UniProtKB/Swiss-Prot annotation:
Quaternary structure and partners: Heterotetramer of two alpha and two beta chains arranged as a dimer of alpha/beta heterodimers.
InterPro entries: Ntn_hydrolases_N, Peptidase_T2
GO terms classed as biological process: proteolysis
Protein name in the entry: Probable isoaspartyl peptidase/L-asparaginase 2
Family under the similarity heading: Belongs to the Ntn-hydrolase family.
Native source species: Arabidopsis thaliana
Reactions catalysed, as given in the entry: Cleavage of a beta-linked Asp residue from the N-terminus of a polypeptide
Function description: Acts in asparagine catabolism and also in the final steps of protein degradation via hydrolysis of a range of isoaspartyl dipeptides.
């Protein structure tokens, strides 16, 4: 074993015109969450507990697309989703259609620990949350002024805004200047919210992963993306822990997170090789990114977009927070 390691993400694919202050806000939040996880890992907190702890922090801050600050549905409401997985015995929990639970990642954890099921959704998940006594808030708590403005403009453009920030061309040349939609005089993509995730391997070599999101801006009611789908947006095994972000439908088709573990197990690839392989061969024309840790203490961030909000740290003192390639 190579010691503990942790990685966090706040979405893949970033507008090259993103203002410096927005970049700095994202870096500060990722740094704060990394440090929270590092302190816990140094105190021998388990991988699964660290994943939940860090994602709760991300859900509480409105900067990214999870918990407070989640993307809005076509009706202006929030329907959140999250999943968490413990690689030790491949235990998992997931939730979708969450409208009043302050921290969806903790409800996903309770589904794993306190229910006979792996996945609960909509009214059933909300009923379970109340029986478990989790913190409940009004749906309005999750709605921010920025997202209200984004939804209005998305409706005017008759479009759905994806949870990545650049047009499908995926290069700096296809920057926000190509978008006709603006808010406050700036390209709409500057305000686009992003999915969050965390992966951890603890000092015992146990891997865990979690992902949380509000989904797509102006999405249809009832839409479910990759984030709560075990094997697509989230996966953990005895080999690794993986959390994905980007074009949800492409990630679902690729079962991207599970594939990292599969090629490690069946092809004998190391973590870097496995991440490179799935990013290159499994996404077709989709754009996505992922963070991953291995049971050997390795940490890798991979993406085929121009950037990804990300941060990682290892027990030997390495720490990095970055956005661009």
């Amino acid at each position: 074993m190579g010691g503990w390691a942790i990685a966090v993400h706040g979405g893949a694919g970033i507008d090259p015109n993103l203002p410096a202050e927005r970049q700095e806000e994202a870096k500060q939040l990722l740094t704060r969450c990394l440090n929270l996880g590092i302190i816990a890992l140094r105190s021998n907190v388990s991988a699964i507990d660290v994943v939940e702890l860090v994602i709760r922090e991300l859900e509480t801050d409105p900067l990214f697309n999870s918990g407070r600050g989640s993307a809005l549905t076509e009706k202006g409401t929030v329907e959140m989703e999250a999943s968490i997985m413990d690689g030790t015995k491949r235990r998992c929990g997931a939730v979708s259609g969450i409208t009043t639970v302050k921290n969806p990642i903790s409800l996903a954890r309770l589904v794993m620990d306190k229910s006979p099921h792996s996945y609960l959704a909509f009214s059933g998940a909300e009923d379970f949350a109340r029986k478990q006594g989790v913190e409940i808030v009004d749906n309005e708590y999750f709605v921010t002024d920025d997202n209200v403005g984004m939804l209005k403009l998305a409706k005017e453009a008759n479009s759905i805004l994806f949870d990545y920030r650049i047009p499908p061309m995926g290069c700096a040349g296809a920057a926000a200047t190509d978008s006709p939609i603006q808010m406050n005089g700036l390209p709409i993509s500057i305000y686009a919210p992003e999915t969050v995730g965390c992966v951890v391997v603890d000092g015992k070599g146990h891997c865990a992963a979690g992902t949380s999101t509000g989904g797509l801006m102006n999405k249809m009611m009832g839409r479910i993306g990759d984030s709560p789908l075990i094997g697509a947006g989230t996966y953990a095994s005895e080999f690794c822990g993986v959390s994905c972000t980007g074009e949800g439908e492409a990630i679902i088709r690729a079962t991207l997170a599970r594939d990292v573990s599969a090629v490690m197990e069946y092809k004998g690839l190391n973590l870097q090789e496995a991440v490179d392989y799935v990013i290159k061969h499994r996404l077709d024309e989709g754009f996505a990114g992922l963070i991953a840790v291995s049971n050997k203490g390795e940490v890798v961030c991979g993406f085929n977009s121009n950037g990804m909000f990300r941060g990682c740290a290892t027990e030997d003192g390495f720490m990095e927070v970055a956005i661009w390639e």
